[in-house]
Amino acid sequence: MTKLTTELLLKKGLPKCSHLKDLKKLNLSKMQLDLKDLDQKLFSQMVNLDELDISHNTLSDLPGNLRLHNLRILNFADNHVEDVTVLKQFPNLEEVIYEDNIYLTVSDNYKVFCLLPKLRRLNNKDITSLANHVRFVNHRELSNRVEAYWESKYKDKLPDKPPSQKINAVAKDFIKAVVDNVRYGPSSLKDFVRWKVEMIARNLIFSLSNDPKKDTDPVLQTSEDTAVENSSKKRESADECTEGSPTKRPRIQIDLQSMPLSPRKSSRLQNSPLCLTPTKRKQETSAQGTPSKFIETKSPKIALKTTPSKKHTNELSAKITGKPKLPLTPKKIHKALDNIEPLHFLQCHSKNNSCEDFKTQLWACAFEPNLDSSCPKAVATCGGDSICIIDCETGKVMKKYKVTGEEFFTLVWTTLTMIGKDGQKRKINVLAAGGKYGVVRMIHAKGSLCYGEIKAHKKAISIMCFSPKQETFLFTGSYDKRIILWDIGVPDCDYNFRPSQLLTLDTTSVPLRMCVVPSCPDEFLVAACEDGCFAWDIGLDKKQGRRSHEVEFNFPLYKEERKDKCFHIIDSLAFLNEDIIASKSVMQGSIYLWSWEKTLKSRKNKNVKKLDAVILSQMKWSSSETPYLVLSTSPERDCVFCGDEDGKIWIYDLDSCKADLQRGKLCSTVKEPTKILSWPLLCSQKEKTVDKTLINVVTVDPTMEYLVALTDINIVSIWKIQ
């Protein structure tokens, strides 16, 4: 036993200082401390303490009021602690270690998940995915069972407006009965389930005594099953999703064998503009027995037929100097947009690496988050059966990942904090990619490893996005007309991970684009679908694990619909800032800028399911009738980009009207594009001339150095913004 004093605590703590309030770390390990040695008066002075180590002592419990509200890391391993509920006094804990406390069980782990909302690591293991599953999915299920038990057994014992005395009389019997009768999960979690059920039951009784408005929504069930495979395991058969899986272009029911070289013709829309059923085809290769792998490749480049300017020639031969480019200021953007020149044209998704492949369609691209300023700017692209990661400056394909028989439609990056074998934290960029097989593949590109797969949907995945607030929260949209929220977890040092399904959102058609609302990332998701634009409540504290849309947005263009024109197909949507959304409909000929906040404020009550979008501005775009040409935004630079069917890239610099947009001022005139980039005349290695193409998607990096456009004819075009 050691007597703790101010002097001793200052000696054991860091940084070295003269006041307890300045301590950030404190190591009291192996000091034979008992419960009575932890003086609350001393500990309450360490208001800024971030990390506390009291491991290898003889503690039977922790004091209940240490007032260490900023504590993030707590280690009390190798003690005699029997109860973890005392940890709720540390709401900001992110990491806890309590190994070798022989009285603590797996049920205590689950209790800690519920008590500590910010906990990410327990006993040196990442638990984000499992903890979120317990906090949300298990909580929902147990809440539903407790409420169902109340409804069937005890509700009739109370009058409509029961007095508190009557509620208290029934409450004691109800709590005892529900704890004894509600079962969930394996027997090893029996103690946790009883504890959790009692908490839920007490909250239910409390809500009745406070007479809130009763929620009469039906209880909806959600599937919690998800299959995970690590890279060391053979991928299971995907026969259930190979036969009849939809193609990426579900515009019209049509025989795919009669398709021309470019599968999109405006006549396809004219034939049956309201038919939204996906086309189907038999896949050439089953997912079974088709291993995925990273491969080395030298991708064919396509040369400019016209001679570039001397300035451009210098750019093509320039090498990376490692000197970071100064970010563009808003005043320089317009000037920069006048100086965008082609840099590389690559055929890196060719079948068999053939330079004659002008049929493979490219669907999505995303710039890798910058973890190191010395690293080259890299962009991930997908199309056909492969994913490429390209150095924008050199045009070199640094990594290529291929899955025979797959057709990738979407990809998205996230940055995770991984713990290495040395115990050190390091940030890694992870790429999630999905497509025809309905499987999300988790790729650590720098490690040249696809470390796992999530069997997310039985039909093809059309779109994905990560939450900007929770880096492990992944939304996947599919041709099965569902959007599912996953917690993908963080891989350990051996790349083992455990994803969890948290929420299912039902859509009325295929989701094409989707975004978490930046101003409220825990509350709403907006998606552009084949029959309109919708928003869902994604709050995980709600009862329903499966939900329909909260609201549908109407656009002025809908009033002009007729038999040969369907404007409900919203094929593009992106946030320009925290409030303004850029979106367009098929055959619209323009792009809408509309306010999320003002639109939602027009909702008079929650029973209103349709809202007129508050349009702030309209921007002229191509009169193309070709669907699924995706726009993108640069929130950092207030710019919008969109390609068209002739290979042109439309660019809108909105800095000049930024103030009006932020004030919600309506612009009555249609805004012209700031610049239109024309497709250059290209010549392949076999002297094939490419004078125009269809641009599927355009994106720029956050610092506005590179613009990347993907085409329908297997060409990745990279442009340099000077």
Swiss-Prot record:
It comes from the Eukaryota. The keyword Cytoplasm applies. Its main location: nucleus. WD repeats lie at residues 456-496, 506-546, 565-604, 623-662, 690-722. Transmembrane segments: none annotated. GO terms for biological process: chromatin organization; DNA replication; establishment of protein localization to chromatin. Signal peptide: none annotated. The entire WD repeat region is required for the interaction with ORC complex components, as well as for association with chromatin and for binding to histone methylation marks. Component of the ORC complex. PANTHER family: LEUCINE-RICH REPEAT AND WD REPEAT-CONTAINING PROTEIN 1, OPTICIN. This is Leucine-rich repeat and WD repeat-containing protein 1. It comes from Xenopus laevis.
